[in-house]
Amino acid sequence: WIAESQMMKETEDVVHMTLDFLPLKSYANITEGNALRVDWESVVPKHELSYIMGNPPFVGYSFQSKSQKDDILSVYVDEKGKSYKSSGKIDYVSGWYFKAAQLMQGTGIRTAFVSTNSITQGEQVAGVWKPLYERFGIHIDFAHRTFRWDSEASIKAHVHCVIVGFSNEPNPAPKRIYTTERYQEVENINPYLLDAPNVFIDSRTNSICNVPQMVYGNKPTD
């Protein structure tokens, strides 16, 4: 309804007249709840789905409330139900990737999310994506690299985003990396949104070469 109303207003501005709402059929299939606590298959059976699309909340791990951190810790768990070591240092949007990857198992569902770009940068990459690749066997089908989020709301959202499409079934379509002006067909898209092998750079406490010990380095965080 919100999108329909926005588009109708823009159309009225173009044609300079008042219009009736488009004859779109409405379905009352909205479920209210915490998406990271709800069993998604209790909302809709996964074998009835073809696509999952969304724009999950943008909350960097440094700005999450206690309840949001608890949400992530409850979602990002291994096969034994234990939270992954990195679960406390990943953005809130990551929970939607994990829930989608779980639901997609044994299906041909394809998923795409608009997300904070930090999940494709730095140490978050291994924390977010390594469980998805190793446990659920997902692969990235297409990606739009970082772009500035420009909403039409009165209070603008000052965030930089990416769009990532992924699945765990073979996809014959060409893999594409998009930027604002163009796209590139590639052999593989890794979690850093590069045309390169799927390599994860984990954080480590010991140096890989003979250099002085670093006590505390530069720390850009979101």
Language-model segments: what does each one mean?
Residues 28:
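Short, conserved active-site loop motifs that form the nucleotide-linked donor/cofactor pocket
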Residues 31-32:
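Conserved residues in the N-terminal Rossmann fold of short-chain dehydrogenase/reductase
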Residues 1-12, 16-20, 24-25, 35-222:
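Signature of N6-adenine DNA methyltransferases within the class I
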